[in-house]
């Protein structure tokens, strides 16, 4: 079994790699076992440096590269009649400190009937769906050098 032990910031355009789909729960762990689409078992024993985001690359000591993709999983999808109503739902869910994925037209969170009832009580629609889960990292998340979603941090970031 191949054991992946390194996180890669980037790979060269001509680098060959395999892919694996992992749930959010698994992508939070530094040690796990998984199966590739081909059925081949792999293991990971990675440094504890944060969540593997969809599109992350990991490698073995021998140089084998694997791209990690977010696996579709059962989620609660929140939709609203207005953007303001969706914003209110995001506020209330954020106050409960649950992992929350934001999109322009919907919010996604892991199944929780109590939270679903709360959101429905605000007048929003909650449905179950299968979708890849990439929740927001939050204001207090570990530092990363990926500033794609944060142009302000990128402009003011200083390495000491």
Swiss-Prot record:
GO terms for biological process: protein folding; protein-containing complex assembly; urea metabolic process. SMART domains: UreE_N. GO terms for molecular function: nickel cation binding; unfolded protein binding. The keyword Ribonucleoprotein does not apply. It is found in: Cytoplasm. GO terms for cellular component: cytoplasm. The keyword Chaperone applies. Pfam families: UreE_C, UreE_N. Keywords: Chaperone, Cytoplasm, Nickel. Involved in urease metallocenter assembly. Binds nickel. Probably functions as a nickel donor during metallocenter assembly. NCBIfam families: PRK13261.1-1. This is Urease accessory protein UreE. It comes from Acinetobacter baumannii (strain AYE). The gene is ureE.
């Amino acid at each position: 079994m191949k054991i992946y032990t390194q996180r890669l910031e980037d790979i060269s355009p001509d680098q060959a790699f395999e892919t694996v789909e992992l749930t959010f729960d698994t992508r939070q762990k530094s040690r796990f076992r998984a199966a590739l689409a081909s059925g081949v078992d792999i293991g990971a024993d990675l440094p504890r440096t944060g969540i593997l985001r969809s599109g992350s690359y990991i490698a073995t000591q021998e140089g084998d590269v694997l791209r990690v993709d977010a696996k579709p999983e059962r989620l609660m999808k929140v939709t609203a009649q207005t953007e303001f109503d969706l914003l209110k739902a995001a506020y209330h869910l954020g106050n409960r400190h649950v992992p929350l994925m934001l999109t322009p037209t919907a919010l996604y969170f892991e199944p929780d009937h109590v939270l679903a009832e709360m959101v429905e009580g605000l007048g929003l629609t909650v449905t179950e769906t299968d979708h890849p889960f990439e929740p927001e990292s939050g204001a207090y998340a570990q530092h990363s050098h990926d500033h794609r979603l944060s142009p302000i941090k990128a402009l003011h970031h200083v390495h000491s």
